[in-house]
């Protein structure tokens, strides 16, 4: 009897593993859900505003057909403070994984899924968050799509890691993120909130902006709601 139970468990495990492999292969091939083609992965579509300069080189304003004021910042234009804060907060093993942090994912499943701990932290890497920003943010319109969205993000994250360096992924993430208050991208956010360039962000300023990455509305430092401003300060500290 015990042997039959053990054999049945092995069969169930084998079937589950095969099903997982089939799902991920199907996602990678684009048979299930939306998988961006190589051309789109190599050239993601996110528009930047055009900066208008005066004769003496000062920025007078920005212009964009997309109705946002995102202005590009290269990796060299970013303060080490914003890079270190982002990695420490969102993806401490960013330099070690290839898109998926198995350890963080397992921890999140056990603590959140099994132990129901809200403060267990997430399992999403910076690469996964970028995948969501670029390709899957508006896809989950029904239950099936929501169930598939996370595996799709995993596959896209792994592909992004193949096509881009770690520095390029960080740069794309910070340029893409919407920091609210018409501050799309790190350059506009640094100017809007602190009146400086991204390369000049101090530790506490970088911590404040990175704190918004988890939930911009909840950690909005200039919100009219004092509770939200308090949340932003607590998150920063």
What are these language model-derived features?
Residues 1-52, 113:
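N-terminal type II signal-anchor transmembrane helix
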Residues 47-49, 53-237:
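Peptidoglycan glycan-strand catalytic modules in the bacterial/periplasmic cell-wall system
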């Amino acid at each position: 009897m015990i042997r039959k139970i053990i054999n049945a468990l092995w069969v169930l495990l084998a079937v589950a593993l095969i099903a997982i492999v089939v799902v991920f292969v199907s996602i990678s091939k684009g048979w299930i859900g939306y998988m961006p083609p190589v051309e789109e992965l190599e050239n993601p579509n996110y528009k930047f505003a055009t900066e208008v300069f005066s004769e003496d080189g000062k920025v007078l304003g920005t212009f964009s057909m997309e109705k946002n004021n995102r202005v590009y910042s290269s990796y060299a234009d970013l303060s080490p403070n914003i890079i270190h804060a982002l990695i420490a907060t969102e993806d401490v093993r960013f330099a070690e994984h290839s898109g998926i942090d198995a350890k963080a994912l397992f921890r999140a499943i056990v603590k959140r899924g099994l132990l129901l701990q809200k403060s267990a932290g997430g399992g999403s890497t910076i690469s996964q968050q970028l995948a969501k920003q670029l390709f899957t943010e508006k896809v989950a319109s029904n239950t099936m799509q929501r169930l598939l969205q996370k595996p799709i993000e995993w596959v896209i994250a792994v592909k992004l890691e193949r096509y881009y360096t770690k520095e390029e992924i960080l740069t794309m993430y910070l340029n893409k993120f919407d920091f609210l208050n018409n501050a799309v991208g790190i350059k506009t956010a640094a100017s809007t909130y602190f009146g400086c360039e991204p390369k000049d962000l101090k530790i506490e300023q970088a911590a404040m902006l990175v704190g918004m990455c988890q939930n911009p509305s909840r950690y909005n430092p200039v919100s009219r709601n004092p509770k939200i401003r308090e949340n932003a300060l607590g998150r920063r500290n």
